[in-house]
Amino acid sequence: MKFFIDTANLAQIKEAQALGVLDGVTTNPSLMAKEGITGKNNILKHYVDICNIVEGDVSAEVNAMDYDGMIREGEELAELHDQIVVKLPMTKEGIMACKYFSDRGIRTNVTLIFSAGQALLAAKAGATYCSPFIGRLDDISTDGLNLIQEIRDIYDNYGFETQILAASVRHTMHVVNCAKIGADVMTGPLSSILGLLKHPLTDIGIAQFIADFEKGNR
């Protein structure tokens, strides 16, 4: 399973990249605003800065909600860097734009997916990635991981090449369970990656090794 980090924070991206396990980055307008990145030129430059840190795909989301606007913004984003994946909303216009881009060899990520039917439409439109939001489904007492399983079954039934990008990942068990189910990619905060390093028995074992070493070298 590929590991993406869901942030626009360059320091966090660099920290994840330094681990040697990062495969890409996902962003959205909210994450850009959180980092104080505003204005078209600044936003576009920030995407390039991210691409210069990582070697993998970088999802850059359109702001337009109309078809023509999505096409215009998506083409501009795709021209920025060959690592850019155009991120589109799961709407009628978004699916139409996804088909337009896929027919022209431009990679896409259809986001805000909350049902297997939406994921099926994204695959039919040729999306490179579909992004089901598991954490937000959990928030309303729905099983987000079950949606990943449903999408996996559908995609396997028909041989769709669209990759399942598990989004709204909140914690390490989301990561592990997505891997068990067969998600192609997970994207989450830095904490969801760093958290995989930790286990109390590992900490106890390391402390014991250090104590034994120091005892034997007094």
Swiss-Prot record:
<dbReference type="InterPro" id="IPR004731">
    <property type="entry name" value="Transaldolase_3B/F6P_aldolase"/>
</dbReference>
<dbReference type="InterPro" id="IPR018225">
    <property type="entry name" value="Transaldolase_AS"/>
</dbReference>
<comment type="function">
    <text>Transaldolase is important for the balance of metabolites in the pentose-phosphate pathway.</text>
</comment>
<keyword id="KW-0808">Transferase</keyword>
<dbReference type="InterPro" id="IPR001585">
    <property type="entry name" value="TAL/FSA"/>
</dbReference>
<dbReference type="Pfam" id="PF00923">
    <property type="entry name" value="TAL_FSA"/>
</dbReference>
<dbReference type="InterPro" id="IPR033919">
    <property type="entry name" value="TSA/FSA_arc/bac"/>
</dbReference>
<comment type="similarity">
    <text>Belongs to the transaldolase family. Type 3B subfamily.</text>
</comment>
<keyword id="KW-0963">Cytoplasm</keyword>
<feature type="active site" description="Schiff-base intermediate with substrate">
    <location>
        <position position="87"/>
    </location>
</feature>
<dbReference type="GO" id="GO:0006098">
    <property type="term" value="P:pentose-phosphate shunt"/>
</dbReference>
<protein>
    <recommendedName>
        <fullName>Probable transaldolase</fullName>
        <ecNumber>2.2.1.2</ecNumber>
    </recommendedName>
</protein>
<dbReference type="GO" id="GO:0004801">
    <property type="term" value="F:transaldolase activity"/>
</dbReference>
<dbReference type="InterPro" id="IPR022999">
    <property type="entry name" value="Transaldolase_3B"/>
</dbReference>
<dbReference type="GO" id="GO:0005737">
    <property type="term" value="C:cytoplasm"/>
</dbReference>
<dbReference type="InterPro" id="IPR013785">
    <property type="entry name" value="Aldolase_TIM"/>
</dbReference>
<dbReference type="GO" id="GO:0016832">
    <property type="term" value="F:aldehyde-lyase activity"/>
</dbReference>
<comment type="pathway">
    <text>Carbohydrate degradation; pentose phosphate pathway; D-glyceraldehyde 3-phosphate and beta-D-fructose 6-phosphate from D-ribose 5-phosphate and D-xylulose 5-phosphate (non-oxidative stage): step 2/3.</text>
</comment>
<dbReference type="GO" id="GO:0005975">
    <property type="term" value="P:carbohydrate metabolic process"/>
</dbReference>
<keyword id="KW-0570">Pentose shunt</keyword>
<keyword id="KW-0704">Schiff base</keyword>
